[in-house]
């Protein structure tokens, strides 16, 4: 049996029997593929191509819209930054003006307080001076009254007392 198999495969041969080699079946299949496959695959490929082109067009449109929105956002950002810088500079100017106004008011208030203190001091000094003059005059009168009764007569004493009282009323 081994020898019959060995001799059957001895050499290369071509089988020209069309029915045994399935050449007709292959020709029918190839012809069917050639005739019907381009329409079927062509339709599928065309639909796929159209879908891809539509997706690309949609992506390009979205990219354009995104670029437009980005440019608009950049412009708005630049505008907002300019406004923020203007607000910052206005705030600095306002803060400086408030600081200067506050310093001016503080200096004026200090001058007013100093002036008030000086006026109070002058008034107190004047009052003390007046009081000291009165006390000195009173003491002088008392001393004079004690020493004068021996030196002056009654008429001179009355005259002197009247003048002293008049002088005290003037102060």
UniProtKB/Swiss-Prot annotation:
Entry's transmembrane regions: 12-34
State if Amino-acid biosynthesis is listed as a keyword: no
Task: Tell me the subunit arrangement.
Answer: F-type ATPases have 2 components, F(1) - the catalytic core - and F(0) - the membrane proton channel. F(1) has five subunits: alpha(3), beta(3), gamma(1), delta(1), epsilon(1). F(0) has four main subunits: a(1), b(1), b'(1) and c(10-14). The alpha and beta chains form an alternating ring which encloses part of the gamma chain. F(1) is attached to F(0) by a central stalk formed by the gamma and epsilon chains, while a peripheral stalk is formed by the delta, b and b' chains.
The highest taxon in the source lineage is Bacteria
Which organism is this protein's natural source?
Prochlorococcus marinus (strain MIT 9211)
Q: Which Pfam families match?
A: ATP-synt_B
Instruction: Tell me which NCBIfam families the record gives.
Output: PRK07352.1
In what way does this protein cross or attach to the membrane?
Single-pass membrane protein
Q: Which family does it belong to?
A: Belongs to the ATPase B chain family.
PANTHER family reported in the protein's UniProt record: ATP SYNTHASE SUBUNIT B, CHLOROPLASTIC (PTHR34264:SF3)
Q: Which GO terms describe its cellular component?
A: plasma membrane-derived thylakoid membrane; proton-transporting ATP synthase complex
Q: What is this protein called?
A: ATP synthase subunit b
Where would you find this protein in the cell?
Cellular thylakoid membrane
Q: Which keywords does the record carry?
A: ATP synthesis, CF(0), Hydrogen ion transport, Ion transport, Membrane, Thylakoid, Transmembrane, Transmembrane helix, Transport
What gene is behind this protein?
atpF
Q: Keyword Ion transport, does the record have it? A: yes
Q: Which GO terms describe its molecular function?
A: proton-transporting ATP synthase activity, rotational mechanism
Instruction: Tell me, in a sentence or two, what this protein's role is.
Output: F(1)F(0) ATP synthase produces ATP from ADP in the presence of a proton or sodium gradient. F-type ATPases consist of two structural domains, F(1) containing the extramembraneous catalytic core and F(0) containing the membrane proton channel, linked together by a central stalk and a peripheral stalk. During catalysis, ATP synthesis in the catalytic domain of F(1) is coupled via a rotary mechanism of the central stalk subunits to proton translocation.
């Amino acid at each position: 049996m081994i020898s019959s198999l060995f001799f059957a495969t001895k050499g290369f041969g071509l089988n020209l029997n069309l029915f045994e080699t399935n050449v007709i079946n292959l020709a029918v299949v190839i012809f069917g593929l050639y005739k019907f496959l381009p329409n079927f695959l062509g339709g599928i490929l065309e639909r796929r191509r159209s879908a891809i082109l539509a997706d690309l067009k949609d992506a390009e449109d979205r990219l354009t819209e995104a670029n437009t929105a980005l440019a608009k956002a950049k412009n708005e950002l630049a505008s907002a930054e300019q406004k923020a810088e203007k607000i910052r500079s206005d705030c600095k100017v306002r803060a400086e003006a408030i600081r200067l106004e506050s310093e001016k008011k503080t200096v004026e208030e200090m001058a007013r307080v100093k002036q008030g203190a000086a006026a109070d001091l002058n008034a107190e000094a004047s009052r003390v001076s007046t009081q000291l003059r009165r006390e000195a005059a009173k003491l002088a009168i008392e001393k004079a009254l004690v020493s004068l009764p021996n030196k002056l007569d009654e008429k001179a004493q009355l005259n002197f007392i009247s003048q002293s009282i008049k002088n005290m009323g003037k102060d």
